[in-house]
Every structure is written in structure tokens, then in C-alpha cells.
Amino acid sequence: MKKFTQVTGVVAPIDRANVDTDMIIPKQFLKSIKRSGFGPNLFDELRYLDEGQPDADCSKRPINPDFVLNQPRYQGASIMLARRNFGCGSSREHAPWALDDYGFRAVIAPSFADIFFNNCFKNGLLPIVLEEKEVDKLFEETLATEGYQLTVDLERKKVVKPDGTELSFEVDEFRQHCLLKGLDEIGVTLEDRDAIGAYEERRKAEAPWMFLGVQ
């Protein structure tokens, strides 16, 4: 998993509440269990004028020029600004996969659906909850300023505006540690490999019968 320490990037505003996971990555793209390759189909039904199909060449599809991600001012965005209840709907880990594959490192919103929120942390994507009035102000500033950028400092738990204003956010200490170190669940376990190895050796001495036939 990629480390997340500090990210500065262009902000892309998705100005609608209750964006569900089917909107983020439609159901026809869920057959793959690889974590990569979903970026071109992120927000597929909003981003293109035709119906998306798996394995279609997205570079040849007609785009919706009014959609945020197709507008030149938001190209290369790495921070998404969203409204309340982002990521609601059915549980699909493909949703954070698609956001990550597109290039987003953080999503800022007043609230998130619980399962989506948890899946983000497992895939190196930082979901940031700010007060609704703070999000409203960020939308106002993002829409008014072309190339509007924010800095997300995970270590300090701050969102920093271009004028230096800092907005604080909360994040669980364990999840913060995992993102800062780039650790998924397996990586966290391997941090204790020495202790695990020592325990196994001790158990082999105490109860050798448990390890009969174990290579």
C-alpha cells in the first residue's frame, strides 16, 4: 500500500449529496478482482455519454463535457471534495480502488457511508470528515479559483488552504499509523514477525506434538 504523509494537489468538486458506490464504479465493472485498471471507469455514467462496457477503449468514447473530471481546470486532481453521505449504497471495495487508480489520495466530505469509509483506509485512500460549513466554504473557493489546491498533512491532521488557513480533522491513531507507514493488514502483522517467530519456537518446545507434519 502506498504511504500517505502529505499531499498537495488540485481539488475536484463533486457537488451532490448521497453519491453511491454504483455511481462511483458501476456494477458491470466489478468482475475483476485486480485493484488496478478502474480509473478510466470512475463515475462512468456521469463521465461518458454512452453506456460503459468492460474492456471498452475509454479513449474512444464520447465524453460529457459538463462533468467535473472532464474539465481542463480539474485535470490531475488528487483531492476530491464531496457532499454528505459519500460512498453510500452497496458494499464494493472497487469504489476506493477506482478513486485510487484515477489518482485521488484523499476525499473530503461532511460524512461518509461506514463501509466505504473503512474500505478507504484499507486501500491507502484518506477519507476526511470536516464540518459542513467548512466543506461549503471549500466548494465556494474551489469553484471560484481555477487550479485551486489544498495540502493534506496526515501527520498533523490538518487540511491547509492556499492562504495558510488550517482545518483540523480527526483520524484513528492506528489508521493514521498504517497510512503513514503504507501498511495494509498483512503489513501490520509483519511488523511483529519477530515476536510471532519467537512465540512459534516457544510453542514448539512446549507442545511439539502440535507441529507434527508441519514443515
Swiss-Prot record:
It holds the Pfam family Aconitase_C. The gene is leuD. It comes from the Bacteria. Pathway: Amino-acid biosynthesis; L-leucine biosynthesis; L-leucine from 3-methyl-2-oxobutanoate: step 2/4. GO terms for biological process: L-leucine biosynthetic process. Its EC number is 4.2.1.33. It catalyses: (2R,3S)-3-isopropylmalate = (2S)-2-isopropylmalate. GO terms for cellular component: 3-isopropylmalate dehydratase complex. This is 3-isopropylmalate dehydratase small subunit. PANTHER family: 3-ISOPROPYLMALATE DEHYDRATASE SMALL SUBUNIT, 3-ISOPROPYLMALATE DEHYDRATASE SMALL SUBUNIT 2-RELATED-RELATED. Belongs to the LeuD family. LeuD type 1 subfamily. Keywords: Amino-acid biosynthesis, Branched-chain amino acid biosynthesis, Leucine biosynthesis, Lyase. Heterodimer of LeuC and LeuD. Catalyzes the isomerization between 2-isopropylmalate and 3-isopropylmalate, via the formation of 2-isopropylmaleate. InterPro entries: 3-IsopropMal_deHydase_ssu (IPR004431), Aconitase/3IPM_dehydase_swvl (IPR015928), AconitaseA/IPMdHydase_ssu_swvl (IPR000573), IPMI_Swivel (IPR033940), LeuD (IPR050075). GO terms for molecular function: 3-isopropylmalate dehydratase activity. NCBIfam families: leuD, PRK01641.1.
